[in-house]
Amino acid sequence: MASLTFGYSTLADRLENIQVPSLDSHPDWDVLITVQSGTAEMPSAEQLAKAPKGDRIQVLAFPGKGVTKLRNQVLANAKGDYLIFADDDVTFDSVGLQDAIEEMQSAELTLALGQAVNETGKLRKKYPVKPVRLNKLNSAKAATYEMIVNTKKVQASGVLFDESFGAGASETYLGDEYIFISDLVTKGLNCYFIPVTFATHPTQSSGSGWGTEQDRKARAKIFDRVFRGNRTLPYLVRVGFGAKKLGKGLTLKNFLLFIFKR
């Protein structure tokens, strides 16, 4: 059976929130926890003592902040044939993960994007009802804990998370998952959405809000990065994405500002 690494990334003061999956009945599963202090200093021994413990749980500590830096450490150090990225407030569906890995093996996928439910068991957003090949237009709503990758294929591709984006970045604190998938797609790698539930995650998240100036500018810059090298497409794509949010937290004025990154 293929092995799987659960790759967590968090800040030191949130370590105790992590609920690792049961490894007892899965000898080929392991847990890798990457943790940052949020400051120039390393996490303290007292903070690290709150991390989950076990024979197949590894903790790697770093100074500073920036979740994409930690995701890249997860990519570099994962031992499993497959890797699922994890936040400190997510719990996983073991059966769904096993089904996903079998499908990834059968279809020779580099990345599978799956579903997640909220605390009540309701799907967190609208998902396709059948497998769909991912591209730069249909993967913008991806969440970290919805992604499983073939570890060796991604490592061989050289694709990493863009460390200018994601939680901890001063301005562009969103979009790192979307950019990661887009870079894999650009490389011609096999990336699909599959209608399988991977995890449970709280309803509110860093990607839930629209409308503030900071949020609007952060989202606008994501499309420049995804479609870099093309001067027109980022504007057209912002029109399409922004239009869907009109009246749903995005005013007409802010819609126009979003298009032009104002």
Task: Give short role names for the model-derived ranges.
Residues 19-61:
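Acidic donor-binding segment of Leloir-type glycosyltransferases
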Residues 208-234, 254-262:
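Catalytic core of nucleotide-sugar-dependent glycosyltransferases
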Residues 167-171, 190-210, 219-222:
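Active-site donor/metal-binding and catalytic loop motifs
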Residues 83:
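Short aromatic/hydrophobic "clamp" motif used to bind/position activated sugar donors
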Residues 61-78:
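Glycine-rich, basic loop-to-helix element that forms the pyrophosphate-binding segment
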